[in-house]
Amino acid sequence: MDIYIKKAIIHQFSPDDTELFLADKFLNITPKIEEYLRKKIERVYSDEAKTGIFEEENPFFNHITDDLLETSVTLANLWKEEFSISENLKTNDLVFVQFSKEGVEHFAFLRIALRETLTHLGGEVDNPIKLTQNNLPGFGTGADEALVVNLQSRKYHLIEKRIKYNGTFLNYFSENLLAVAPKISPKKSIKELEKTARRIAESFNTDDFQFQSKVKSAIFNNLEESNELSPEKLANDLFDNNLTARLSFIDQVKEAVPEPVQFDEIDASRQLKKFENQKLSLSNGIELIVPNNVYQDAESVEFIQNDNGTYSILIKNIEDIQSK
């Protein structure tokens, strides 16, 4: 991912008086600062990101200008108005970034909750371990909330967390601050696909381990082949001999996932890794991990249902066995 950090500014929100401490200067983009911001932005392009496209007249989008200082102050104040109602307020850094990705201008807004951390102070003899406040999380940790916007296409990627207010949980970031209705994340969409497939299979008394393995294989194969999941194609793969089940699956899936699950600009590697193997836990304590391509090959693995209702698993053509 070719990301070039141009400018960044950081403001701070204090929970004590719900005030903002506004900076008036940009960050000095040292190599380490550049790496830190770049990694935070890269993590937004994950399977947990909600996506959408801002309408041209969207008020939030129209606050984003070339003047990063003015933009950041305006958006920080708008954010504070919506976030301050939360019942669990913490000190947060609000980071605003101008950057280019693959040569296209982008904007990022990162909310990073600061942590308490134990620090070893080498010069202290009697008490070298101190509890320090307002520490940024490490390089490998994502922002608590993040918005990345392609300023050319108006497409956005959003990582958001709900806040609790009057006993209810609110998607304050998307609903109130951005005033948008994003698509649900690929990760959540896939969970909906799995859940719906099992529900349909249960209604036809076919939800056994073989069907669940079939679901995993279908998701893996479709992701690997086309980098997207189409409800219609999955329905054909899962319920090829049952028209009623196919139509029911498509109708029920589209209530939660109205469009194909696409991984455009989003890293699908975590989902591919999740579904690349079949994991079976047997009643006798044996656990098997079988790669999908082997699992689907009758010359390698065969499942036999015995007359007494039990199963036997025949593993064939093994050239070598190693103990690990």
What are these regions (language model features)?
Residues M1-K274:
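Long, hydrophobic alpha/beta structural blocks
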Residues L238-K324:
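C-terminal structured domains
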